[in-house]
Amino acid sequence: MISPAQDPYASRTDRSSAIIARQDPVVYGEGKFADALSADQVQSYERDGFLLLENLFSDEEVAALLAEVERMTRDPAIVRREEAITEPGSNAVRSIFMVHVLSPILGRLVRDPRLANAARQILGAEVYVHQSRANMKPGFKGKEFYWHSDFETWHVEDGMPSMRALSCSVLLTDNNEANGPLMLVPGSHRQFISCVGETPRDHYKQSLKKQEYGVPDPVSLQLLAEQGGISTMTGKAGSVVFFDCNTMHGSNSNISPWPRANVFMVYNSMENTLNPPKYGLNPRPEHIATRQAFKAVRPLDSLKLVER
C-alpha cells in the first residue's frame, strides 16, 4: 500500500491542506489518437481544463434522452435501487448511477462517437466507463453541490492512479444562469488541492447527497478563482461540456422555476485502471466506480443515436 509520503497526490491525511502542481499531462499523445476535435478545441481544453461544444446533439436526440431519464426517475423499480440517490431531506431523485447499463439508449450514448472519440483523443488511449449518471435539479428545490475535484475523490476513494480521465456532461435541458448550471474554474486542473479530514467509513452514502470530506479549503479556492475566474456552463439542450478529472467545479441550488437535467459519462484510460483505494479504505460499489466489469468502449459506427 502506498503511504501518504509516497503518494504524489496525497489527500485527507493528517497533514494540512496544500496546493500541489499537477504531475500528469492534460492531453495525452498530442491529441492524435482520434480526430473528433479540432486542434483549436484540443488546445482550449488543455488550457482551460474544459471545453463546451454547443448543439452537439439534435432536438430529436435530446427529446429521446430526456424522456428516458424522466422515465427512470419515475420508475419505482429503479428508484428503489442503490443506484438512485435522493436529495438531502427528501425523496426527490438527485442522481441515478450506472445509467449506461440500466438504459439501452444511454448505453448507446456512452458509445456515441461524438463523446467516445473525443475522450479517446484527449486521453490518448482506449477508454472505459469509470462512472455514468443522470443528474437532476428540479425547479425550486434542486440542491447545490459544493466545489470539488473529481480526481481527489477518485484517487483517494477509488484508487485511480493518475489524472487520465475526463467527464462529459450532456445537457438535456437548457442550462441558464438561474437553474444551477455547472461552474468550473479555468486553469484549476493544473493544481491539485490536498484536502484535510479523515474519510469516514462508507463515505459515499453521504457524499453523493452532500459532500463534506474531500472538499477544498476556502483559501485554496479563493486563490484558484482569483487566478482563473469562474466560468458558468450555460447552453442550449444538446450541448456538451467535456472537463478534466481535476478541474475544480460545483453548482448552485436551483430556486428558479426551470428544471435542469444532465447526463454525465466519465471515461478513464484503459492504461489508468483502478488500484485499491488509498490508506486502507474499502472500495466503493461497482455502480459508482467500475473496478471489475469494465471493457473498452467501442464507438458506434454512425451518429444514429435514436433508433426508429
UniProtKB/Swiss-Prot annotation:
Involved in the biosynthesis of 5-hydroxyectoine, called compatible solute, which helps organisms to survive extreme osmotic stress by acting as a highly soluble organic osmolyte. Catalyzes the 2-oxoglutarate-dependent selective hydroxylation of L-ectoine to yield (4S,5S)-5-hydroxyectoine. One of its GO terms (biological process) is ectoine catabolic process. This is Ectoine dioxygenase. The record marks 154 as: Important for ectoine stabilization. Keywords: Dioxygenase, Iron, Metal-binding, Oxidoreductase. Homodimer. It catalyses: L-ectoine + 2-oxoglutarate + O2 = 5-hydroxyectoine + succinate + CO2. Fe cation binds at residues 148, 150, 249. Its EC number is 1.14.11.55. The gene is ectD. 2-oxoglutarate binds at residue 137. Belongs to the PhyH family. EctD subfamily. Binds 1 Fe(2+) ion. One of its GO terms (molecular function) is iron ion binding. L-ectoine binds at residue 131. It comes from Bordetella parapertussis (strain 12822 / ATCC BAA-587 / NCTC 13253). Its cofactor is Fe(2+). It is an enzyme of class 1 (oxidoreductase). It comes from the Bacteria. The lineage of its organism: Bacteria, Pseudomonadati, Pseudomonadota, Betaproteobacteria, Burkholderiales. The keyword Lipid biosynthesis does not apply.
